[in-house]
Structure formats: structure tokens, C-alpha cells
A protein has these predicted regions:
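Switch/coupling segment of Walker-type NTPase motor domains
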Residues: 54, 61, 86-97, 101, ...
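Glycine-rich phosphate-binding loop of nucleotide-binding enzymes
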Residues: 50-53, 60-62, 68-75, 414-495
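Conserved structured core elements
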Residues: 64, 131, 154, 311, ...
Length: 561
């Protein structure tokens, strides 16, 4: 709504003195092992990490349902429960990326295994260029003490996870070490230094938790950039100018091949206060209308002619009031920041320019936080702390349009097989169907789309990585050359072929309650019904004859007698 375009500035400030060390820059007081973090001002926070779901490829109806569910999720938070949505894109270390589990088996196919492993490693290296994308929600509550904050945070955490479950989103709360690991990753761009921390080490070393996560240095002396260790960074905020937003804005920013953190600090406005404020705005607009009409009468022109902006503001205010009163909408104050990190200043400026281009595409503007780089950076940390005093009024629908979902990744461990690349996220698809409730699978596609190639690739992967038996039913004869190349046996079943299937063969050592003869009789009845039964199937007399003949044939084996 155009009425809400003007940004607002917080009146409440938290006194933060100039930091004298890298540790003092990190804006928290205590990190507890259970994941509760105490922030300045007797505020306590907790973080939940959540996974992606398939939104971009969903049907319009499913997307509408997800949007409605996400709107309800946002409406859960009241004015006493500010929260932070964090989207962290980090460039992972080569050793921490997905590993290929195809060991050598000391046979003549090890050279093929090596070639296949090299191919998989190449695909994994190309997938998102080594960018790990994580999503977090951090919620805060004010409390006088830890004992008061813990049960309240526990209830909120249970509600948040329940709301995620209703959306079909997998999530997990982070304990203290996991939260420290996230902070360590944000303050050590490029993951050059592994995170080493144990709660047992604190009393032994006399160090605090900040000592384990702080970088070598921070440098915030420049107005538009900063340094964290050897990396360059820039903090910006999104100025939302568009009257209607697109759900692609956030997704396109997060799809970039860049190390960045997108943060949305959201504060719910009390519903009665929001309605009262809008009514006050409508009254102000009404007075402005009266003044304009008086001017018109004095000037001698039609009093119905009003400035276009005044008419637009009046219409927008009336619509906003209607949404708040009757459409289950709430009012939020949103701080939207983007922090880019790069190894060089030139790469940093290029990344910021790219993000700015995406913002302009959707009628928004990416503004640099001049002389507020430190506040912008610490506000991007997954802590729940907001030091940027720029807010934008948004309704539930306009806030929910920043859908945090795109596509769900499939990357299983163990003897997972390679199934290609995710077309949306450009990540590898690795799955072990034997671990699923149903291990069955189908290849569906139009002619020439690569179904046979995909099946052969999976066959080779199974052959090289597992000890599974592979049986191929191949009526078109497509797989015989591959089977022979892998040392398999090809059995041709056809008229004139020396091979045949004996449907009368019987296993007499079955440990089953039913006799082998009864089971074979049932099988032969089904076979005859399929071959000669026609549309109506076998007649009762025919079934009786077949059953009796089967028993006579096997009489010499003394089965079923």
C-alpha cells in the first residue's frame, strides 16, 4: 500500500558502547548449552533451523495454500514476540561438501569406478558452486531471568515447530553449540577455519564462547564497506517502493552465486494500536480534503477536484483499515537487510550491484547503510538482535509475499545413488531408494527425453557402488550390450531361442504353511487365465480341470497327497 511506503525509525534504542575487541562487537551476553541466548537488555532468544519445501514447482492451487499457511504462521507472533528470519548463503569448504561413497572392490571394474567417482565429484563441485543455503527463524522474549525465559521460550518453540509441521516443513531447534557453529560460519567467510568447540573446554581454558567464534579482526572505519578477517563486506537495506510485490524477489536473491545473508527482522504491531493509527490517518486525510475544498471554493473552481495523491492516500487508507478489521490481516514493522561478503572489494561491488539489479527489477531499491555497517552486520547474525533503526510498515499479505521456500533438496547419505541435478537449485540429487518406505521407482517422460539413459546410469551406479543383484527385463533388447560389458548374463526368451521358462518347476523345500502344490496350482491357474481366459476369464469347469491335472502331474513327487 502506498500509505505505508514511508519508513519509520525506532524510538527505543539500546546503548552499545564502541567495541574495543572483536568479541565485544558480537551482540550477545551469554550463550547457554540448551540454545538459549541472552541479548542486551534482558532479552532471550532461541533459533530453529528449517528445511525447504517444493513451492516453485507446485501448482497454482498448492502455491496459494502454502502462501495462506505462511500468512497464518506470521500471524502467530504477537507484539510481545519479535522474530528474525535469516537466510544464510555460505561458501563451504571442499572437505565439508557432499562425499561420494563408492569404495574400490579390487576387481577389474575399479578403473570404471574411479572414472565414475571423478564425474560425480565434478557434478558436486558445479552444484551451486559450493554454496550452502540455510534458513533459520529466531524469536525473542523479554524476561527478568533465565528461569523465567526458559519455559516461555519452550512453549513458543513447540508452537513454531507445530506451525512448520502443518506447512509440511521439517525443522529442528538448535542447541548452543549449533548456534555457535552458525555464528562462526557467518564470521569466517569461505569456511577457511573449521569450528572447534566443546563446552568442556571453557573451564579448562578460561575462554568464553565468543573467543571460539570471533574472527581475527573487524574493521568498520569505512562508510560503505567493512572488513571481517581478510574478507570484504557490505551491509544494505531493501527500500520497498512497489505497491505490489512478487514472490520471486527473495528467491532470486538467494539463488545468486554469492556469499550473503538476507535478514528480515519483524515486529508485530498491536492490532488495536494499528487500527487506531490507521483511523487517525483517515481523519488527517479527511481534514486535508476539507482544506482543499475550502481552497477550491475561495478560488472559484469545483470543490470535487482534489489532488491525485490525496485521493490515492484516502483509498489506500480505507482498504488497509478494511483488511485489518475483516480480512485477518495484521500490521508488521519490517527491517529487510542484505549483507554481502566477498574475498575482494571488486567482487563485493559486483555482488552488491547484482542484488541491486534484482531489487530494481521488482520496483525496490537496495540502499547502502552509510556509516552503519557495523549495525548492519551484527543485525545479520542469527541472534535476534536488530541494530538497524529502519522499518517499513507491512500487512500480513505483503510480508508473507517473501516466501522462504523454493524447492526441496534430496541428498541422502550412505550408498546413495546419483539421479541428476535439481533444475531449480542446481544441486545434485543423491538418494538411496532402499531406505524409503517403498523402494519402487518409475522413469516417466516423452519419447527421446532420456528415460533409457537414466535407467542405464542408475544400473551402472548400482553395479559400481553396491553388491545388489540386478535383473533387467528387456523386451526391446536395449540393455544387452551394457550387461555383457559389465560381465552379466544375457538370457534370451523368444521363439526359437535355446532358453525357456519352465512354469511347472516347483520348489519343494518351502517353509510355508501352504503346501508347494497348492501354491503352484494357484500360480498355474493365474497363468492359464492370463493366456487363454479372454475377457470373461476361465469358467468354473475349466478351473476344476486345471486344478485336477496339476495334482495328477505332480503325483509322482508325493506332494499334497
Amino acid at each position: 500500500m502506498s500509505l505505508l511506503r514511508k519508513t519509520k525509525t525506532k524510538s527505543k534504542r539500546i546503548d552499545r558502547r564502541a567495541a574495543l575487541s572483536a568479541q565485544q562487537t558480537i551482540p550477545y551476553v551469554v550463550m547457554h548449552p540448551d540454545g538459549i541466548c541472552q541479548l542486551p537488555g534482558s532479552v532471550f532468544s532461541k533459533t530453529v533451523e528449517y528445511e525447504d519445501i517444493n513451492y516453485a514447482v507446485a501448482s497454482t492451487e498448492d502455491q496459494t495454500a502454502i502462501f495462506s499457511g505462511w500468512s497464518s504462521f506470521l500471524n502467530y507472533f504477537d507484539c510481545s514476540l519479535p522474530f528474525q528470519l535469516s537466510f544464510v548463503n555460505r561458501r563451504s569448504r571442499a572437505t565439508s561438501r557432499y562425499k561420494v561413497n563408492i569404495p574400490a572392490q579390487q576387481d577389474k571394474y575399479d578403473s570404471i569406478r574411479d572414472e565414475y567417482v571423478d564425474m560425480l565429484k565434478g557434478q558436486i563441485a558445479k552444484s551451486n558452486n559450493g554454496i550452502d543455503r540455510s534458513k533459520y527463524i529466531t524469536f525473542n522474549i523479554p524476561a527478568a531471568s533465565m528461569s523465567e525465559a526458559r519455559p516461555r521460550l519452550g512453549r513458543v518453540e513447540a508452537d513454531v515447530m507445530g506451525n512448520f509441521k502443518r506447512l509440511g516443513v521439517q525443522c529442528q531447534p538448535l542447541d548452543g553449540r549449533e548456534r555457535l557453529a552458525v555464528l562462526h560460519g557467518q564470521m569466517h567467510p569461505g569456511q577457511r577455519e573449521p569450528f572447534r568447540f566443546s563446552w568442556k573446554d571453557i573451564p579448562k581454558t578460561g575462554m568464553g564462547t565468543k573467543d571460539y567464534i570471533a574472527p581475527d579482526s573487524f574493521d568498520f572505519r569505512q562508510s560503505r564497506t567493512f572488513r571481517v578477517g581478510q574478507a570484504w563486506g557490505a551491509a544494505s537495506y531493501l527500500q520497498i517502493l512497489a505497491s505490489e510485490m512478487s514472490d520471486r524477489l527473495l528467491a532470486e536473491i538467494l539463488e545468486l552465486d554469492a556469499e550473503l545473508t538476507v535478514t528480515m527482522h519483524i515486529q508485530t504491531v498491536d492490532q488495536l494500536k494499528a487500527i487506531k493509527t490507521i483511523k487517525g490517518k483517515i481523519s488527517d486525510i479527511g481534514r486535508m480534503k476539507v482544506e482543499e475544498q475550502k481552497k477550491a471554493v475561495r478560488s472559484g473552481y469545483d470543490m470535487e477536484i482534489l489532488p491525485p495523491d490525496l485521493i490515492t492516500f484516502s483509498k489506500d487508507a480505507a482498504e488497509l483499515l478494511s483488511e485489518l478489521q475483516s480480512r485477518n490481516e495484521r500490521m508488521f514493522l519490517l527491517t529487510f537487510t542484505v549483507v554481502n561478503i566477498a574475498p575482494t572489494r571488486q567482487r563485493l561491488e559486483n555482488d552488491v550491484f547484482t542484488v541491486s539489479g534484482i531489487a530494481q527489477k521488482y520496483n525496490c531499491a537496495l540502499k547502502r547503510l552509510d556509516w552503519q555497517q557495523e549495525q548492519g552486520f551484527v543485525s545479520s547474525l542469527v541472534l535476534g538482535y536488530n541494530g538497524v533503526e529502519i522499518q517499513r510498515g507491512m500487512t500480513t499479505s505483503s510480508t508473507a509475499i517473501f516466501i522462504p521456500f523454493m524447492t526441496r533438496e534430496l541428498r541422502m547419505g550412505g550408498q546413495a545413488l546419483y539421479y541428476g541435478m535439481n533444475a531449480l537449485s542446481n544441486n545434485v540429487i543423491m538418494a538411496d531408494r532402499k531406505k524409503l518406505k517403498s523402494a519402487n521407482g518409475l522413469y516417466l517422460g516423452s519419447t527421446g527425453s532420456g528415460k533409457s539413459f537414466a535407467a542405464k546410469r542408475e544400473l551402472i551406479n548400482v553395479f559400481l557402488a553396491t553388491q545388489d543383484r540386478i535383473i533387467v527385463v528387456d523386451p526391446m533388447g536395449e540393455y544387452a550390450p551394457l550387461i555383457r560389458r559389465l560381465g552379466g548374463q544375457v538370457i534370451e526368451i523368444a521363439p526359437g531361442s535355446p532358453h525357456y521358462i519352465n512354469p511347472m518347476d516347483i520348489a519343494i523345500n518351502l517353509n510355508d504353511e501352504d503346501s508347494p502344490l497348492s501354491m503352484k496350482a494357484d500360480f498355474l491357474l493365474s497363468l492359464c487365465e492370463l493366456v487363454v481366459g479372454g475377457k470373461e476369464g476361465l469358467q468354473p469347469i475349466e478351473r476344476t480341470v486345471i486344478d485336477r491335472c496339476v495334482r495328477l502331474v505332480y503325483r509322482e513327487l508325493a506332494l499334497g497327497l
